[in-house]
Amino acid sequence: MGESQPVKTFDALFDELTERARTRPEGSGTVAALDGGVHGLGKKILEEAGEVWLAAEHESDEALAEEISQLLYWTQVLMIARGLSPDDVYRKL
């Protein structure tokens, strides 16, 4: 049987991205996206949302999960750019 990859939670990803934003490692795509601002992040989220929709209509569950993970990543980067925490979002669920 193949090895399964470790599971990363929403909160663990947020902590990882927050640390990247704080330490600003050279060459980080997350840092570059944050430096690009909210407008660019919003455009990226719209792009990823469209890819989620298309994957849901035409691709495998695995491809859909991949697209959803990318949408979650970009949503979290936008949250960091705006100073929101997961708890800010959880209170709205």
UniProtKB/Swiss-Prot annotation:
Functional pathway: Amino-acid biosynthesis; L-histidine biosynthesis; L-histidine from 5-phospho-alpha-D-ribose 1-diphosphate: step 2/9
Gene Ontology CC: cytoplasm
Enzyme class at the top of the EC tree: hydrolase
A single GO BP: L-histidine biosynthetic process
Keyword ATP-binding attributed: yes
Enzyme Commission code(s) on record: 3.6.1.31
Principal place of residence: cytoplasm
UniProt GO MF annotations: ATP binding; phosphoribosyl-ATP diphosphatase activity
UniProt cross-references to Pfam families, sorted A to Z: PRA-PH (PF01503)
CDD domains xrefs: NTP-PPase_HisE
Keywords: Amino-acid biosynthesis, ATP-binding, Cytoplasm, Histidine biosynthesis, Hydrolase, Nucleotide-binding
Compartment(s): Cytoplasm
InterPro entries assigned to the protein according to its UniProt record, in alphabetical order: HisE, PRib-ATP_PPHydrolase-like
Catalytic activity: 1-(5-phospho-beta-D-ribosyl)-ATP + H2O = 1-(5-phospho-beta-D-ribosyl)-5'-AMP + diphosphate + H(+)
PANTHER family registered for this protein in UniProt: HISTIDINE BIOSYNTHESIS BIFUNCTIONAL PROTEIN, HISTIDINE BIOSYNTHESIS BIFUNCTIONAL PROTEIN HIS7
Family membership noted in the UniProt record: Belongs to the PRA-PH family.
Name recorded for this polypeptide: Phosphoribosyl-ATP pyrophosphatase
Species of origin: Mycobacterium sp. (strain KMS)
